[in-house]
Amino acid sequence: MVTRWLYSTNHKDIGTMYLIFGAFSGVLGTVFSLLIRMELAQPGNQILNGNHQLYNVIITAHAFLMIFFMLMPALMGGFGNWFLPILIGAPDMAFPRLNNISFWLLPPSLLLLVSSALVEVGAGTGWTVYPPLASIASHSGGSVDLAIFSLHLAGVSSILGAINFICTVFNMRAPGMSMLDLLFVWAVFITAWLLLLCLPVLAGGITMLLTDRNFNTSFFDPAGGGDPILYQHLFWFFGHPEVYILIIPGFGIISHVIATFSKKPIFGYLGMVYAMCSIGILGFIVWAHHMYVVGLDIDTRAYFTAATMIIAVPTGIKIFSWVATMWGGSIELRTPMLFAVGFLFLFTVGGLTGVVLANSGLDVAFHDTYYVVAHFHYVLSMGAVFALFSGFYYWIGKITGLQYPETLGQIHFWLMFLGVNITFFPMHFLGLAGMPRRIPDYPDCYAGWNAVASYGSYLSITAVLFFFYVVYKTLTSNEVCPRNPWETTPGVSPTLEWMLPSPPAFHTFEEIQV
């Protein structure tokens, strides 16, 4: 039994392990976020006794856990592995053993990340790991080095997974299936290209930081002719595509869910594909909008402002196409659809604040305030995460063969929806009022909205606990999931996974699909 999971080369088993790993890391990351909100519940030192370094270690750990160990493993590793081969009619991934090591690089990576927080003073650098704060002068112990090794392992894991997905889509499609068939497949395919192109840049940047810290190089040290701004360019050339890596698989899931529960095919299919490709390409040429305050030329800032705003165009195409799909559809508001509609609304809010932040003039005021925190939590904590839950409720019956309890799923949605909005909406006001990020204490004038935000986070925690109760009920109540639980209308042919039994056999498609 142990060897089945340890040595597994089966895409479904590996996908399941990714999902369990993502759930575990997500709980860990959620605990850190709760600590942050408890510290910020009132002015003054609350639970960390004025330990600013520890506060920043918690912030850093929260970010790394949620991004590299929750969202990416669950969306790409979990749903990507589970459903991409099934959707294209392939028996498995192109390189099943590569798939195995892609997963098994993650637990050691997580171990290194946790170790970095536990040795010396921890890595209190923020997830950006900027020097000179991350240099040996300011973080003298082994913490930052451990965090860098953790990132290296997670990066190798993602690159190998990306190569696997790309080869699978190119080479493993069933006869007669064109490249242009399903939006989730497109989403994973585009995301894989982004990973493949941007992770090596991160690897280079953090390796240079590693040698600066340990081998006396001075890539980022002005005393030796280096420049810390170079690190920012390298990091954000990875960091901006990274946020699209987190959201694009979510786009794919949302497209499938909205089409299924509106009982009609997606509106503007080809436009959706081109929009995702455009977002992927544009994501690589806007990185310096994270750096408006470092002293870029005026013309550079003008270019990055314009380029960043252009990303709103394909994103808008996607939003309106989803709305157009629902328009005139026979909408059924089951839990996956609730999360998808919630995604639409909240992702749009996050996108609007993104357009505000794209302006280099305005961003000088907003940079490093809670306005930025509000913006990226709207697109991540309510965009990517809602897409994740939507996909979970959509596919859990197919994965386990057991259907979730509908009422409990809907309760989970409303708890979550209220919780995250009460947490993050007030942060816009705090940011406009100038409250800085990454600081564990604040003047009394910010007390009101911080208290509200902290109460919101307690509600979100309740929602997370309730979600695990829903999972428990699903796995123990034995409500068998039929082949296709979402009785799709005759006019709309269901995608390939709904033609298989729930759960599918260990080896699907033993004969070629036509």
From Swiss-Prot:
Mg(2+) binds at residues 367-368. One of its GO terms (biological process) is electron transport coupled proton transport. Keywords: Calcium, Copper, Electron transport, Heme, Iron, Magnesium, Membrane, Metal-binding, Mitochondrion, Mitochondrion inner membrane, Respiratory chain, Translocase, Transmembrane, Transmembrane helix, Transport. Its cofactor is heme; Cu cation. Its main location: mitochondrion. Fe(II)-heme a binds at residues 62, 377. This is Cytochrome c oxidase subunit 1. It comes from Prototheca wickerhamii. The lineage of its organism: Eukaryota, Viridiplantae, Chlorophyta, core chlorophytes, Trebouxiophyceae.
